[in-house]
């Protein structure tokens, strides 16, 4: 079979299926999505999978944690010998630079974690013996993924390491440090890691830069920025954790983050306020249009229904009202829930 395999947050399969269908149609490639709610993945079946993968960049996909090109689907695998059918399915393939054996991040998929770990240890030497895997990881060569959907059902897929998530299952394993004011700190940590390339992070998040955090209390996002030695104006009527203020990099203004504006242009504005997504999109657009910030990261809380429609509407609204040339990326991060995180950078 041929198609794209994309992992997602369980429950958001319809949104990912809609996104893949719309984006594939836009680039002129026919196909259809195969999925069930809470599976934690979507299989987009199409004849031109490699061409579609090249046109749908991983960082530009909103609801996909990972993007892979399927090369085979194996059903009815004998649990006593899973290696032989996999080697047969890979006959004629080029040598891979790495192997990841995975499972969906779902209630049905998580019990397969033990199988994935143990089978990876068995498959790796067999692939090397067959000349299908390099002796050491080679990131410049395609990466082989074996995704178990059940003990006797697996998808074989390939990833371009330059255009895919660099973490198994597409999940960055971030540790919540004891001094973090709230779990929301993980959202901004992941956003900086996922939405920006390493080169962009080095260029755009530098010590001495100035930022605003709207709706900052208790200070999770502010704290993440101070760890990058960024000076932060934290705007919230609520209190910040004392140790955040003690960094010497934070000015706490007790004000409404929705109405406050800076006296001078800032390098960054970040916002994780619980508010209607269209209202947030409009306010964020005002910040960009008025030149109050050069770059921004903000969250949009999605409704329970028509989440893909609301996502498109809010992003279109933001870009139209910003009235500037922008590079916009959006992602439902692992640490997001019913929301997406948006990055906008001035061109």
From Swiss-Prot:
Its EC number is 2.1.1.186. Monomer. GO terms for molecular function: S-adenosylmethionine-dependent methyltransferase activity. One of its GO terms (cellular component) is cytoplasm. It is an enzyme of class 2 (transferase). The lineage of its organism: Bacteria, Pseudomonadati, Pseudomonadota, Gammaproteobacteria, Lysobacterales. It is found in: Cytoplasm. The active site is at residue 301. Belongs to the class I-like SAM-binding methyltransferase superfamily. RNA methyltransferase RlmE family. RlmM subfamily. It catalyses: cytidine(2498) in 23S rRNA + S-adenosyl-L-methionine = 2'-O-methylcytidine(2498) in 23S rRNA + S-adenosyl-L-homocysteine + H(+). The keyword rRNA processing applies. It holds the Pfam family FtsJ. S-adenosyl-L-methionine binds at residues 184, 217-220, 236, 256, 272. It comes from Xanthomonas axonopodis pv. citri (strain 306). SUPFAM superfamilies: S-adenosyl-L-methionine-dependent methyltransferases (SSF53335). This is Ribosomal RNA large subunit methyltransferase M. The keyword Transferase applies. HAMAP family: 23SrRNA_methyltr_M. Catalyzes the 2'-O-methylation at nucleotide C2498 in 23S rRNA. It comes from the Bacteria. Keywords: Cytoplasm, Methyltransferase, rRNA processing, S-adenosyl-L-methionine, Transferase. The gene is rlmM. GO terms for biological process: methylation; rRNA processing.
